């Protein structure tokens, strides 16, 4: 069993039940899925950028990403409907817990001048989205082999009904939120 899943079952669930007064264990919010997305604006001119981003995402997550395509043509961006403009991976189950554990404990501490992540990016329905400026913070990515520094969006989808429940869930799981002083 993944270390983070074990922590969730043994520490986080009982704490959340006590704090929010849940009567049933099934009411306790849990992490449902994690979606990692890399938007590729440069893919319009450079089609090799897609392959590089797919390779990076595959190394980071251990799962083959799908490519996302443009829905509409936009002349100002020289974009046609159906062109590949990004890649994304949806992680669930064991892989999700392993990735989140690596993100919190290995990757985020490698960010320069890291003080924690903002707790303002909740969407009102218990989901949290954060952005990373570079893929180099993951130990699976070798500095010499990347062609371009790319950022990514990471969305944590929870079963929480409110942002307060989701914030508490993620805090107990070990997400390093900025300390408000």
From Swiss-Prot:
For this chain's UniProt record, which GO biological process terms are given? translation
Q: Which domain of life is it from?
A: Bacteria
Keyword Ribosomal protein in record: yes
The molecular function terms in GO held by this entry are: rRNA binding; structural constituent of ribosome; tRNA binding
Record's PROSITE patterns?
RIBOSOMAL_L5
- List the GO cellular component terms: ribonucleoprotein complex; ribosome
Q: Name one Pfam family in it.
A: Ribosomal_L5_C
Q: Which keywords label this protein?
A: Ribonucleoprotein, Ribosomal protein, RNA-binding, rRNA-binding, tRNA-binding
Q: InterPro entries in the record, alphabetically?
A: Ribosomal_uL5, Ribosomal_uL5_bac-type, Ribosomal_uL5_C, Ribosomal_uL5_CS, Ribosomal_uL5_dom_sf, Ribosomal_uL5_N
Q: Extract the NCBIfam families matched here.
A: PRK00010.1
- What is the protein's quaternary organization? Part of the 50S ribosomal subunit; part of the 5S rRNA/L5/L18/L25 subcomplex. Contacts the 5S rRNA and the P site tRNA. Forms a bridge to the 30S subunit in the 70S ribosome.
- What is its biological role? This is one of the proteins that bind and probably mediate the attachment of the 5S RNA into the large ribosomal subunit, where it forms part of the central protuberance. In the 70S ribosome it contacts protein S13 of the 30S subunit (bridge B1b), connecting the 2 subunits; this bridge is implicated in subunit movement. Contacts the P site tRNA; the 5S rRNA and some of its associated proteins might help stabilize positioning of ribosome-bound tRNAs.
Which family does this protein fall into?
Belongs to the universal ribosomal protein uL5 family.
Name-wise, this protein is Large ribosomal subunit protein uL5
Organism of provenance: Desulforamulus reducens (strain ATCC BAA-1160 / DSM 100696 / MI-1)
- The gene name on file is rplE
